[in-house]
UniProtKB/Swiss-Prot annotation, chains A, B:
This is Recombination protein RecR. The keyword Transcription does not apply. May play a role in DNA repair. It seems to be involved in an RecBC-independent recombinational process of DNA repair. It may act with RecF and RecO. Belongs to the RecR family. SUPFAM superfamilies: Recombination protein RecR (SSF111304). It holds the Pfam family RecR_C. GO terms for biological process: DNA recombination; DNA repair. The gene is recR. Keywords: DNA damage, DNA recombination, DNA repair, Metal-binding, Zinc, Zinc-finger. Residues 81-176 form the Toprim domain. GO terms for molecular function: DNA binding; zinc ion binding. PROSITE patterns: TOPRIM (PS50880).
Amino acid sequence: MPDFAEPLARLITEFKRLPGIGQKSAQRLAFHVLRAKREDAEHLSQAILDVKDKLGLCAVCNNIADGEICQYCSDSNRDPSVVCVVEEPHNIVGIETTRQFEGRYHVLHGALSPLRGVGPDMLKIKGLVERIGQGEVREVIVATNPNVEGEATAVYLARLLKPLGVKVTRIGMGIPVGSDLEFADEVTISKAMEGRREM
Amino acid sequence: MPDFAEPLARLITEFKRLPGIGQKSAQRLAFHVLRAKREDAEHLSQAILDVKDKLGLCAVCNNIADGEICQYCSDSNRDPSVVCVVEEPHNIVGIETTRQFEGRYHVLHGALSPLRGVGPDMLKIKGLVERIGQGEVREVIVATNPNVEGEATAVYLARLLKPLGVKVTRIGMGIPVGSDLEFADEVTISKAMEGRREM
């Protein structure tokens, strides 16, 4: 790797710490910033700090919020009787892009993982139990990831929440729309068979 | 697109202004910053400003420099009699990774483009002529891009500099190493034929 002037080398290193950014992308980004107007660089620089300083977690659902309560929990048009449980705040983005779900959310900030020492106490489950205790919630849709940790979390939540009198459902698993059976692994295909629907 | 809290939406917008970063990548980067330690966010934020504030152009070759003279011009191990002319500072990176070139550089900061109104006066050509006037330069290697603008710039430089008594050469064009003839366009193939070498 050639020598860059120190501030440029440092910016490249910082960009490389971001996910999906390798040496070449980091160089391209750094040279872009170098060519950009100082004003634009300032905006980016400030936006990075503001995200850390001005955002907190919603007191109800633990989603990212710029106030005490996030925009989904404070939206009275959304149905409080259906709560979709996700692992991370960015999972909400994917669900919102469907424009299908009109309920509320609950963010666990992780998934159970005995291997990595993540137990139920380290997830934001207590708040979910409290929300259900208030009696408004009718259904909990568990939208944790379809992997070992997400599945374990889903099973744990089902056992914990069903006795409280709520319906606990799991998002459907199967072949992605637009994909090809050829590319699906056997576990996905067997889930798709299990989850078949009458036409 | 779902609604993000304002600081997060702003950071996503700022990331999207960077080259090669679309909506999805910008979201991933922004959520990464959100999860990162404040210290790490500060380092990135500061590095962006430092690149604008602490770097200038080398007084000799117009490369990026954190002092008055860049590291290549101040390196006495490098041969001052061979000068490689490039369009942009980041082009030097590609040449340096070969570890083959031991001469000096000259950065034009652009290429001639009548269509976009870029004439010779807008490129840093004057300094190059002055360097040659000092008598130390023996060969100028024109490593501008192999496209219309870069080629026009190369032809212009050759006409301008040859009368000053220096050898002006152009980097070789042909089939990229590791590629396949099948994927090469006809102009590249004809350049490769022209540039053939006896074995």
